[in-house]
């Protein structure tokens, strides 16, 4: 499912870059191209090893501000390569309290559980 989102540096929240990507509930993390993140002054905080398409890749990891449906949150992100598509993963959806409505093909507020 395609979605429009805003990306911002939590330390400079007024500068927002509008992007288009896909929501993938099978992806744990959000992937944003490195050039977009670095253009906002977002730096990696660590490097991680991830399984992707049957093999392993190493990518930098950081935190970025994300705007979805008018709400702003800070989410963990993977620094994507030039060929990577922007992906909004399940962790970001949970932080926002959102889920996919498969009938309408949109995002909607999720029923939140307190466990």
Which role does the model predict for each range below?
Residues 1-115:
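Pepsin/retropepsin-fold aspartyl endopeptidases
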């Amino acid at each position: 499912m395609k979605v429009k989102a805003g990306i911002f540096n939590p330390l400079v929240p007024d500068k927002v870059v509008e992007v288009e990507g896909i929501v993938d509930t099978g992806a744990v993390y959000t992937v944003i191209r490195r050039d977009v993140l670095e253009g906002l002054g977002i730096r990696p905080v660590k490097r991680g090893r991830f399984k992707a398409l049957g093999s392993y890749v190493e990518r930098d990891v950081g935190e970025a501000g994300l705007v979805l449906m008018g709400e702003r949150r800070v989410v963990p992100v993977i620094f994507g390569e030039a060929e990577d598509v922007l992906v909004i993963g399940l962790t970001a959806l949970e932080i926002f309290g959102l889920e996919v409505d498969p009938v309408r093909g949109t995002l909607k507020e999720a029923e939140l559980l307190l466990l």
